[in-house]
Amino acid sequence: MSHRKFSAPRHGSLGFLPRKRSSRHRGKVKSFPKDDPSKPVHLTAFLGYKAGMTHIVREVDRPGSKVNKKEVVEAVTIVETPPMVVVGIVGYVETPRGLRTFKTVFAEHISDECKRRFYKNWHKSKKKAFTKYCKKWQDEDGKKQLEKDFSSMKKYCQVIRVIAHTQMRLLPLRQKKAHLMEIQVNGGTVAEKLDWARERLEQQVPVNQVFGQDEMIDVIGVTKGKGYKGVTSRWHTKKLPRKTHRGLRKVACIGAWHPARVAFSVARAGQKGYHHRTEINKKIYKIGQGYLIKDGKLIKNNASTDYDLSDKSINPLGGFVHYGEVTNDFVMLKGCVVGTKKRVLTLRKSLLVQTKRRALEKIDLKFIDTTSKFGHGRFQTMEEKKAFMGPLKKDRIAKEEGA
């Protein structure tokens, strides 16, 4: 029998088995940060949509490092995060077998984009979701029952979470069905949490009330789907020599004769991508404000810095490729994040106490690149492009036709 002479580490991790398509499109938070009653009441997660990537220039503040006080260029991802709307409150009690839902209370008014989430086919449905439930808020018996529910939640619950949804109409996406999730409320006593949640029923919660500048967060999402792939692409096994009979992008030995089965740990072809993943420790470089109207003027300069005073928005020329324009609040994260453009991402507060110097470093952005991401962009703004190009033929023709 021939065998290889040396052993080697296995290719690919078995920690992510089974490598199959994710059952859910929205990233699921499997554990929220530990509660600390001494802190003020706050939310622990938020939903955003991946718009695209660009790069920034910043000055490093790391005394003792070779790049201290020097400029570095870094890749960043823009995640659009319009305000989320709170539409419900859920109380949990702790049992020996984990958390159990105790009571769920929904708001009186729920928007259609949220109701769509409860239907497979909104167009053909009667659109009756929550019509009976909202009457609770209008008659006296219903109000008494709701007050009773809230008081029993204060008495018995240990964990309070809010049900919040995204606002799809604010985004440049075709989808109308909002994404809905439970977000844990941390900080303060249970009574304070419940009062905080009640005040915000049917209200919008912006991203800057959840996360702060220079904070380290975790990003949960589903990766880009790649379809059915061979073993070399999927597990990064070594290609066999050129003269190998019946193909070389294969595994040479898939196991012994007996046991007469292929072990689960052997690399095989199959689905690659569209897997649920959690990436920890993504640093927030900037929490940007969306377009706003001030004194009758539309303010767009959310990509200006103290060093680059040009009046420009975060959108590159021509918008983000395969996404469009970011007009709402956004979060700028260092490096890349999972998923394709338009993918919904769950941003969660870090589960760990951050102590490393890089995590606590203050970020001082000098420049944000807004050149076109479709080809080799060279202009930061349309004004800069027009000044360089001069009068164009199409402008002259349009002027002549207008005259």
Curated annotation (Swiss-Prot):
GO terms for biological process: cellular response to interleukin-4; cytoplasmic translation; translation. Residues 1-37 are annotated as: Disordered. There is a cross-link at residues 39, 224, 226, 286, 366, 386, 393, 399 (Glycyl lysine isopeptide (Lys-Gly) (interchain with G-Cter in SUMO2)). Its main location: nucleus. The modification Tele-methylhistidine is found at residue 245. InterPro entries: L3_arc_euk (IPR045077), Ribosomal_L3_dom_3_arc_sf (IPR044892), Ribosomal_uL3 (IPR000597), Ribosomal_uL3_CS (IPR019926), Transl_B-barrel_sf (IPR009000). The keyword Acyltransferase does not apply. The modification Phosphoserine is found at residues 13, 304. Component of the large ribosomal subunit. Interacts with DHX33. Belongs to the universal ribosomal protein uL3 family. Component of the large ribosomal subunit. The ribosome is a large ribonucleoprotein complex responsible for the synthesis of proteins in the cell. This is Large ribosomal subunit protein uL3. It comes from Homo sapiens (Human). The lineage of its organism: Eukaryota, Metazoa, Chordata, Craniata, Vertebrata.
